[in-house]
């Protein structure tokens, strides 16, 4: 994962009062933190937007991932963390043409 994306996502969680350690190269850590703090994040994501600078692909991906997280929360995290990670990784690979 691009360091800039990881930094933005960690800031998003931090802004919501959630301390999470991005200790994997995929998005498992993110979806685990989201699921563990669903109510707190649901309220936070309704009131905030994140701007990135520079790279259009990064901006596109981060805002798309935010929308996916919001939808997942609206569905009461019905899909597993693993399924959400697979979705995010698939889209990440398509956009950035990177294989893990």
Regions found by a protein language model. Give the residues of each.
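Alpha-helical bundle regulatory/interaction domains
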Residues: 1-100
């Amino acid at each position: 994962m691009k360091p800039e994306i990881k930094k933005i996502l960690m800031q998003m969680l931090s802004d919501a009062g959630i301390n999470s350690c991005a200790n994997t190269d995929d998005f498992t850590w993110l979806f685990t933190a989201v699921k563990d703090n669903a109510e707190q994040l649901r309220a936070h994501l309704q009131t905030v937007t994140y701007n990135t600078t520079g790279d259009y692909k990064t901006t596109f991906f981060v805002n798309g991932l935010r929308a996916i997280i919001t939808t997942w929360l609206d569905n009461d995290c019905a899909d597993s963390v693993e399924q959400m990670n697979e979705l995010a990784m698939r889209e990440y690979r398509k956009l950035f043409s990177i294989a893990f």
